[in-house]
Amino acid sequence: MSEQNNTEMSFQIQRIYTKDISFEAPNAPAVFQKEWQPEVKLDLDTASNQLADGVFEVVLRVTVTATMGEETAFLCEVQQAGIFTIAGIDGTQMAHCLGAYCPNILFPYARECITNLVARGTFPQLNLAPVNFDALFMSYLQQQAGEEPTQEA
């Protein structure tokens, strides 16, 4: 075994928590009197920062906006965060871990939070589809390299 392979790769979730929540229904109660045919827009963003040697905070920001014509039915924003201990990887592997693997772990928590907030606003159930953070991360890398993202069939 070479010296390069002596560093053992490890990954541990220290904590998963909700960092920020916002729910707005600016046109309630008038919006409840209309036929429910919204256009739903989903925006995602991730950020990470190093807290200590091998300890990282990753924040997944999810914003869901439902509009009916020109009116906003609701706007829901959640920042789901996690603290992760990561050792034995660096460079592109670390970037992938922080930009795709950790957000994959955080997304179900954010989705549940959003679903609950929308239900508490008495809007019809909102089911967010799973997100392919690996594909989003690859697209981000291609944009950073100045390439056009490729579309998969």
UniProtKB/Swiss-Prot annotation:
Pfam families assigned to the protein according to its UniProt record, in alphabetical order: SecB
What is the predominant subcellular site recorded for this chain? cytoplasm
Under Gene3D superfamilies, the record lists: SecB-like
Instruction: Provide the Gene Ontology terms for cellular component.
Output: cytoplasm
Report the locations given in the UniProt record: Cytoplasm
**One of this protein's GO BP terms?**
protein folding
Q: What does the UniProt keyword field contain?
A: Chaperone, Cytoplasm, Protein transport, Translocation, Transport
- Self-association state and partner proteins as the record states: Homotetramer, a dimer of dimers. One homotetramer interacts with 1 SecA dimer.
Q: Which family does it belong to?
A: Belongs to the SecB family.
Among HAMAP family, the record links this protein to:
SecB (MF_00821)
Role description: One of the proteins required for the normal export of preproteins out of the cell cytoplasm. It is a molecular chaperone that binds to a subset of precursor proteins, maintaining them in a translocation-competent state. It also specifically binds to its receptor SecA.
UniProt name for this protein: Protein-export protein SecB
Q: Could you tell me which species this protein originates from?
A: Edwardsiella ictaluri (strain 93-146)
